[in-house]
A protein has these predicted regions:
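Glycine/Thr-rich phosphate-binding loops that ligate phosphate moieties of nucleotide
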Residues: 1-123
Length: 123
């Protein structure tokens, strides 16, 4: 349940991104870090996010990403050069139609919506 809660929270963020730009459905995502090696977590994420997942083929992806962003920030690289500098990624999970997971996500969304007032009214 804890892992599903994390996956559903990530889906909420992804839905906000998708809603902000309807032209780009964000159908593929890249994973990095320790969790990206566990096939059960990858599949849960793919199913919950409704996206294909690709694992970054780089053991220090977070450090590399930070260095690339810093390089852009100081003008060493232009943003459009990042694609060529990004490490390769291998497909690791495709989303499945998991009706039981979808039902649990619907409950999560409903319960989360009920708590919204706690954060907007200070109750």
């Amino acid at each position: 349940a804890a892992f599903e809660g994390v996956a559903f929270a990530l889906r909420a963020g992804l839905d906000a991104i998708r809603d902000a730009d309807r032209r780009d459905p964000v159908a593929t995502l890249r994973l990095a870090g320790g969790g990206s090696v566990d096939p059960r977590w990858r599949q849960l994420l793919a199913d919950a996010l409704g996206a294909s997942l690709h694992a970054i083929d780089c053991p220090n992806a977070a450090t590399r990403g930070a260095a690339l962003l810093a390089g852009v920030a100081i003008g060493h690289w232009r943003e459009d050069a990042l694609h060529a500098l990004a490490p390769a990624a291998s497909p690791v999970a495709e989303p499945r139609d998991d009706r039981a997971l979808a039902a649990r996500r619907a409950r999560f969304v409903d319960l989360y919506a009920r708590t919204d007032a706690w954060f907007t009214t200070g109750v």
